[in-house]
Amino acid sequence: MPQIYQCDAASIIIENQMFSFNDFKVIASKCEILRLSNVVIMNNDEIIPETEEDQFYFEAAISLETLFQALPNVKTFTYNLPKNSLNIIITKTAEELLKIPHFLSLDLFKISQIPEIFDIEGFYGHIKENKKTKIELDFSRHLSFRYKFRLRTIVAEILETESRDYKLPRIYFSRITRSAHDKMLALHYQN
């Protein structure tokens, strides 16, 4: 990739790419709208793989919270995680995201292909207090029965609550009932 020394773009869409963290910061640190799809940001010390076969070894990928810390101006954040999101989402991702001040002031936070390692319990606490950010969570198809059961319970709690003092999220996962999905979607877009 040619060297970029400055980028003042307010809106950026990146698909099917691998970047060093330094290159990513140059490209995206000033943007307000960022959409990533199948993108891996590698630790600066790692060599970016040359071939597509090498792209499935993401041990050196930086975590979502590290990535997010480099985006102080972002207001709309969408990330369709790569299929092998090893190290991008870790057990402390939800907890660490909530410590980042500009994360709490987002207009939209949408993430897809979320693996089971994501701490939905901790993030659900944030959802119930969130009054600003539209949150859309699409989970991976590869979830345990227990994790899906917890997601169903969270969705049911949200839908059964009559007086909500928070922005209703959109949560999707395989095995969500059609009626729960449709009701959540309708309420989410009314918000």
Q: How would you describe each model-predicted region?
A:
Residues M1-N191:
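The conserved beta-strand core of Leucine-Rich Repeat
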